[in-house]
Amino acid sequence: MAKPAKRVAVTGAAGQIAYSLLFRIANGDLLGKDQPVILQLLDLPQAQGAVKGVVMELDDCAFPLLSGVVITDDPKVAFKDADVALLVGARPRSKGMERKDLLSANAEIFTVQGKALNEVASRDVKVLVVGNPANTNAYIAMKSAPDLPKKNFTAMLRLDHNRALSQLAAKSGKPVASIEKLAVWGNHSPTMYPDFRVATAEGQDLTKLINDEEWNRNTFIPTVGKRGAAIIEARGLSSAASAANAAIDHVRDWVLGTNGKWVTMGIPSDGSYGIPEDIIYGVPVTCENGEYKRVEGLEIDAFSREKMDGTLQELLEERDGVQHLLG
């Protein structure tokens, strides 16, 4: 018996990240190889032609799991009964634009989208914000959707997590899949803190395998933090395929579970680890039965505290910068 189709809404559907994302969703990479999907694609009125072109390509792939496609410029149509919402579209920073202008431009977008989700999405909708500043955009959407559970709103730190995994695998000479118990704390920005103090590779303690605190502080942390900028420098374009891949990883794990493995998600803080409530902050989690659960009881040393508080400070400033726009 075929499963009923799940509705997956994707914003910024004409953009580069979406172009790397939509074909994989239609192929079953997001929700499983036995789960039909209906794609509900949102973009601006002037982008509708480009979205239609992408949908022509989706049609031409003849994906067995793709049960239907909706193209719209209306958030209430895009989010209608959505089971998953991938908020990819955001206002990019243009030349000479102040950060506060970027925050307020995005506050407008994510307030509208949060309200639409609140009105029409499934009450169990899983929302992932990819568009930057992702944590604060997720916070704005969450605040604009008071009737939905706060836990439904998450921000993407999986790209930072995957970038950190790759750097650790290269440094330790161990396969990337063997690395466990990595955490990334805080904001999806250069201030986030990748933390491998308790991580293992093939069951061995990674800090002993690498044994280089100077590398950790002066190479590893800045490399992960500035990787996006390095890709723009090299490619002339921002990381789109790796961001799409991280979005797939994030939602697939949330829906289908991590089998006890740690992953990183930006989630509403509950006050643990000295991070105040009412903020979306990256923490290590495990997922099962469609729910995430933060990893508890980790020791926080002085260096980690400093890094975690630094990224928290940035998040609090961003939150304060949009508070007046939230009514």
UniProtKB/Swiss-Prot annotation:
<comment type="function">
    <text>Catalyzes the reversible oxidation of malate to oxaloacetate.</text>
</comment>
<feature type="binding site">
    <location>
        <position position="106"/>
    </location>
    <ligand>
        <name>NAD(+)</name>
    </ligand>
</feature>
<keyword id="KW-0816">Tricarboxylic acid cycle</keyword>
<feature type="binding site">
    <location>
        <position position="132"/>
    </location>
    <ligand>
        <name>substrate</name>
    </ligand>
</feature>
<dbReference type="InterPro" id="IPR015955">
    <property type="entry name" value="Lactate_DH/Glyco_Ohase_4_C"/>
</dbReference>
<keyword id="KW-0520">NAD</keyword>
<feature type="binding site">
    <location>
        <begin position="130"/>
        <end position="132"/>
    </location>
    <ligand>
        <name>NAD(+)</name>
    </ligand>
</feature>
<dbReference type="InterPro" id="IPR010945">
    <property type="entry name" value="Malate_DH_type2"/>
</dbReference>
<feature type="binding site">
    <location>
        <position position="93"/>
    </location>
    <ligand>
        <name>substrate</name>
    </ligand>
</feature>
<feature type="binding site">
    <location>
        <position position="163"/>
    </location>
    <ligand>
        <name>substrate</name>
    </ligand>
</feature>
<dbReference type="GO" id="GO:0006099">
    <property type="term" value="P:tricarboxylic acid cycle"/>
</dbReference>
<dbReference type="GO" id="GO:0030060">
    <property type="term" value="F:L-malate dehydrogenase (NAD+) activity"/>
</dbReference>
<feature type="active site" description="Proton acceptor">
    <location>
        <position position="188"/>
    </location>
</feature>
<dbReference type="InterPro" id="IPR022383">
    <property type="entry name" value="Lactate/malate_DH_C"/>
</dbReference>
<dbReference type="Pfam" id="PF02866">
    <property type="entry name" value="Ldh_1_C"/>
</dbReference>
<dbReference type="InterPro" id="IPR001557">
    <property type="entry name" value="L-lactate/malate_DH"/>
</dbReference>
<dbReference type="GO" id="GO:0006108">
    <property type="term" value="P:malate metabolic process"/>
</dbReference>
<comment type="similarity">
    <text>Belongs to the LDH/MDH superfamily. MDH type 2 family.</text>
</comment>
<protein>
    <recommendedName>
        <fullName>Malate dehydrogenase</fullName>
        <ecNumber>1.1.1.37</ecNumber>
    </recommendedName>
</protein>
<dbReference type="Pfam" id="PF00056">
    <property type="entry name" value="Ldh_1_N"/>
</dbReference>
<feature type="binding site">
    <location>
        <begin position="12"/>
        <end position="18"/>
    </location>
    <ligand>
        <name>NAD(+)</name>
    </ligand>
</feature>
<feature type="binding site">
    <location>
        <position position="113"/>
    </location>
    <ligand>
        <name>NAD(+)</name>
    </ligand>
</feature>
<keyword id="KW-0560">Oxidoreductase</keyword>
<dbReference type="InterPro" id="IPR001236">
    <property type="entry name" value="Lactate/malate_DH_N"/>
</dbReference>
<dbReference type="InterPro" id="IPR036291">
    <property type="entry name" value="NAD(P)-bd_dom_sf"/>
</dbReference>
<feature type="binding site">
    <location>
        <position position="99"/>
    </location>
    <ligand>
        <name>substrate</name>
    </ligand>
</feature>
